[in-house]
């Protein structure tokens, strides 16, 4: 049976003349709309999700709109189109698809037999949209572009999250430009967790910061002073590349009051010529830290290696591959031809 999920149009309260959705504590501004989502989008103080949708539709429409639709589809023709999974995977982007359809034509009605995060098998019809055929076709490609990408991310995330257990899988900032929140939302739908959203919500001391500061300890000390002077409270992570750097961080933390919360263990997974990996350095670092801080493994993380990495006791495993080079899930949206012809004959247009 198909279930109908209500959709509430979202308007940012301070933009009366030009409604825009600015994502703050969630991408939805009303309580009911938030509660209707299976997985809420991550928080972002400035991300304009409605603006992203409008931009995607605008780049497709250009200055003349859909000239093919205008030429071939009667403006008042009603139709129904079905979402079809063309391969197995995890579906993500249902909530976003509803936002896009509503932006194109608020009169369109959607029904779904599944939720975001559910598994689909090849050949399954898992949703439908009803209304003006013109509107459905105009929205089709933008909806599918988002849904296929999000579903690809969610599918890989689910596989990696299952394999990484008991470690938690994270994505990175290696997202498609302009789609940061959308990509990270898909990771949540797939069962992963979000790393920092951007440069603003977590201090992350990486190799370039360490080089510029003159060493790991100096970089940490500068961060601690900065946070204290500016009365800021947020997570602090430092990248380490060797066991010596791990010892230096632990040394610093034992002698100084610090805001440090997590230690990244970068490229401590060593690929071997036989295709396996050596995690002995990573395991040594985790044992050395001994639960005093969260740990994050990074580098040489794939679906094939993530299980072995997860068995080292590391808290988190981050993978840029979740978002920077993911394969889209094959999904189509097809108009019910018989229904369209029936309506066309009835209105003497077919």
From Swiss-Prot:
Pathway entry: Alkaloid biosynthesis; nicotine biosynthesis; Cofactor biosynthesis; NAD(+) biosynthesis; nicotinate D-ribonucleotide from quinolinate: step 1/1
Reactions it catalyzes: nicotinate beta-D-ribonucleotide + CO2 + diphosphate = quinolinate + 5-phospho-alpha-D-ribose 1-diphosphate + 2 H(+)
Top EC class for this record: transferase
CDD domains: QPRTase
EC number: 2.4.2.19
GO terms (BP aspect): alkaloid metabolic process; NAD biosynthetic process; nicotine biosynthetic process; quinolinate catabolic process
A molecular-function term among this protein's GO annotations: nicotinate-nucleotide diphosphorylase (carboxylating) activity
Function field: Involved in the biosynthesis of pyridine alkaloid natural products, leading mainly to the production of anabasine, anatabine, nicotine and nornicotine, effective deterrents against herbivores with antiparasitic and pesticide properties (neurotoxins); nornicotine serves as the precursor in the synthesis of the carcinogen compound N'-nitrosonornicotine (NNN). Involved in the catabolism of quinolinic acid (QA).
Protein name per the record: Quinolinate phosphoribosyltransferase [decarboxylating] 1a
Protein's organism: Nicotiana tabacum (Common tobacco)
Lineage: Eukaryota, Viridiplantae, Streptophyta, Embryophyta, Tracheophyta
């Amino acid at each position: 049976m198909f279930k109908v999920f209500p959709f509430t149009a979202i308007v940012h309260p301070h933009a009366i003349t030009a409604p825009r959705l600015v994502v703050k504590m969630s991408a939805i501004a009303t309580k009911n709309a938030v509660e209707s989502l299976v997985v809420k989008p991550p928080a972002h103080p400035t991300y304009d999700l409605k603006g992203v949708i409008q931009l995607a539709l605008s780049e497709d429409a250009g200055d003349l709109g859909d000239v093919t639709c205008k030429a071939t589809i009667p403006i008042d023709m009603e139709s129904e189109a079905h979402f079809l999974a063309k391969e197995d995977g995890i579906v993500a982007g249902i909530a976003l698809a509803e936002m896009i359809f509503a932006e194109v034509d608020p009169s369109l009605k959607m029904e779904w037999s599944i939720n975001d995060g559910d598994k689909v098998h090849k050949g399954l019809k898992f949703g439908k949209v009803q209304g003006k055929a013109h509107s459905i076709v105009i929205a089709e490609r933008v909806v599918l572009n988002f849904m296929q990408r999000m579903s690809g991310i969610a599918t890989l995330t689910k596989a990696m999250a299952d394999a990484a257990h008991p470690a938690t899988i994270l994505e990175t900032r290696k997202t498609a430009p302009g789609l940061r929140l959308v990509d990270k939302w898909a990771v949540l739908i797939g069962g992963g967790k979000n790393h920092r959203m951007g440069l603003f919500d977590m201090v992350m001391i990486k190799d370039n910061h360490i080089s510029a500061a003159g060493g790991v300890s100096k970089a940490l000390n500068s961060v601690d002073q900065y946070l204290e002077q500016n009365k800021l409270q947020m997570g602090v992570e430092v990248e380490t590349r060797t066991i010596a750097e791990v010892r230096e961080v632990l040394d610093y933390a034992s002698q100084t009051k610090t805001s440090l919360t997590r230690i990244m263990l970068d490229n401590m997974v060593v690929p071997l010529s036989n295709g396996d990996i050596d995690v002995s350095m990573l395991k040594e670092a985790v044992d050395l830290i001994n639960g005093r801080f969260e740990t994050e493994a990074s580098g040489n993380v794939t679906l094939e290696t993530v299980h072995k990495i997860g068995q080292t006791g590391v808290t988190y495993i981050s993978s840029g591959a979740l978002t920077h080079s993911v394969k889209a899930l094959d999904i189509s949206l097809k108009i019910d031809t018989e229904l369209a012809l029936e309506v066309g004959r009835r209105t003497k247009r077919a």
